[in-house]
Amino acid sequence: LLSFDPDKNGGVASAVLDNNGYPGVKLTRTVKLDRNKFIDRFEAQSEEEHTYDYVLALSDKPELGDGFVDARLEGKSPAYEFIKGVKSKIYKNGIVTFKAGTTKFEIKNTYKTPIEVFWAEAPDIMYGSSEKDTHTIKSYMLVVRTKGKNLSISSVIILGKKR
């Protein structure tokens, strides 16, 4: 953790992981909360080519529009094997905007190169305070994938009111 600066409307936190998460990759993340707006800036730097996935777990189905095709989401993590019914679409301009429930999302590859967006229904999210009080809710995975030596993703998430 580099910094944590809370304020009356939220605050800003910043962290760096240099070579410890993935050999040869420096990861930097800065998140800011300003009332109902959440801004996430995620960067990766390397001397080698990588496949980078920016992953969101959503409790509401994303409203992404047309043009998605059946796909297979492959990755190094065994968690990818649990995600079924995957759809994908390439966004040549590197920007995807959508809603999920009452929340609005704008995710940009700030290098303005294409991104591939995958989404699928994922295993349900379980929550509760005890074994007898456990509930599940539907869960959706959204993965923004890009390839290259470096990654720079900027997300703006505007939280809507609960229904």
Report residues per predicted region.
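CBM-like, beta-strand-rich accessory domains located in the C-terminal region of large
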Residues: L1-R163
